[in-house]
Amino acid sequence: MLAAEREDWIASFRDSDQLMPLYDRSGARTTYAELLAAAPRDSADRVTESKMAAAYDRTFAAVAELKRQIDATSLDVLIIAGDDQHELFHDTMMPALAIYYGKTIRNAAQQDVPHENWYGRAQMQRLEPERDAHYPVHANLALHFIEGLVARDFDVCAVGGLTAEQHEGHAYSYIHRTYLEGRHLPVVPLLLNTYYPPNQVTPQRCVQFGRHLRELIASYPEDLRVGIIASGGLSHFVVDEELDLGVITALKTKNLDHLARLDPKRLQAGSSEIRGWIVAAAAATDLDLQWLEYIPAYRTPALTGIGMAFARWS
């Protein structure tokens, strides 16, 4: 939704959501028709044009505020905890956890898309408007993570570069194109398999991963100002406010036990991206959650949509 225009929030998703694979709030496969039949009577009132426009405005105000806060931190490096959705990895080889340590990472240039293809146009916003970009990676810090994790009995996949046709996935390109626009801040991409069975990383493992990252940041010999960002939503593509608010409460109170005990069955499809938030929270236990904005962005009467969350620890 973050790449879509206001009019697409209001109208276009109503059709596309009826065709996509969906999971209910228990994590079971379901259909749009089944969700619509089970929705409360007032569900249509949650997706009026005015309410969806207001959700759009709140969301992009939060995006702008998070960008402002990132700009103000004077970071030396930004760790991106994201998920790869068949962009670099496929079912032929899907690591549960990977760290990219090449010196740069490529984002591709946009391709021409027919104007009537609103979804394709939205997808292109993740790519570069004119030519490929090669963004800097803090390779030494990435290698420090890889070597330190292996020493801690963490079997992490090491990714040293891309083939000519590959480029970074949207969890990473969105950060570059939106929050780091115009900057050449080095990053360290963490690639989590949140989406795809049979080896989705567990919430407990995400907590362990984040804790180890915090230790390794502290032990790095160079004095760096390091940030970590979770790139991904809370619940989607069925909004689950109960799940989201439980996660948010745990973030505020640093309740890693709650996050570790989240039922993996509920973390399917887009909701699986909560795992990235778990990694970031576990890496930031020495910091306090200073700001958070949550928008349950419903987009159909079946209550599909995305639980949008934006936060800052410091």
What feature does the model see in each segment?
Residues D76-G82, L190, L224-G232:
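Beta-strand elements within well-structured catalytic alpha/beta cores of enzymes
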Residues D84-H86, L234-S235:
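Catalytic metal-binding/acid-base residues of hydrolase active sites
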Residues G232-S235, E241:
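Divalent-metal (often Zn2+) His-rich catalytic cores of metallo-beta-lactamase-fold enzymes
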Residues H90-I99:
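Glycine-rich loop at the start of a catalytic domain that most often binds anionic cofactors/ligands
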Residues F89-H90, V238:
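Short helix/loop capping segments that flank catalytic or ligand/cofactor-binding pockets
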Residues M1-T73, A98-R211, E215-S219, V239-S314:
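Flexible, D/E/H-enriched segments
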